[in-house]
Amino acid sequence: MNLRKLRLLFVMCIGLTLILTAVPAHARTITNNEMGNHSGYDYELWKDYGNTSMTLNNGGAFSAGWNNIGNALFRKGKKFDSTRTHHQLGNISINYNASFNPGGNSYLCVYGWTQSPLAEYYIVDSWGTYRPTGAYKGSFYADGGTYDIYETTRVNQPSIIGIATFKQYWSVRQTKRTSGTVSVSAHFRKWESLGMPMGKMYETAFTVEGYQSSGSANVMTNQLFIGN
């Protein structure tokens, strides 16, 4: 085979590789409790009861619909192994763009858990009929807006380790938005400065949550960056 043919074969192989790696993951719809990995992102649909539907799209994108529920969470992000702190993981941020149609109490947020100590956390950018609150800890400015910080305690409630008592940490934006950047690590650092300790990271995910409500959301963009 001459040099020209070898070069042509090489170019054809490279082109085929690029085409294969560019093929998007097939969309998949789930309706009951399930977790797994899709298109490079960890996902989970969790509900206690009611009607739910979650369509897993390419990358971090997904859509969600719910009605007649008690509590339901739809999310795509990253589940860690609870061995490293957010400091050890490096900077965490999320770029997102969504349409959000809450028919009652629901949140558009960054959500997750830590262990040792066990804590559930929310960075809420938009909500439905109820704006989350709790014991006020302070406020700070991030990503073009001011967030109010609250702490609550859940007693004998479901958690990632079963029924437990644990803290909830909240950053709630004063003005709603449905697109932008969330500098997740900036919230973690602010919480710690206010005496709200972060443990080993279990999860960070872009999340739609509904509580005793109906609604829908379409998360067109959800890009999670870790260690940048």
Swiss-Prot record:
GO terms for biological process: xylan catabolic process. Pathway: Glycan degradation; xylan degradation. The keyword S-adenosyl-L-methionine does not apply. Its EC number is 3.2.1.8. Residues 29-222 form the GH11 domain. The active site is at residues 120, 209. This is Endo-1,4-beta-xylanase A. It comes from Bacillus pumilus (Bacillus mesentericus). The gene is xynA.
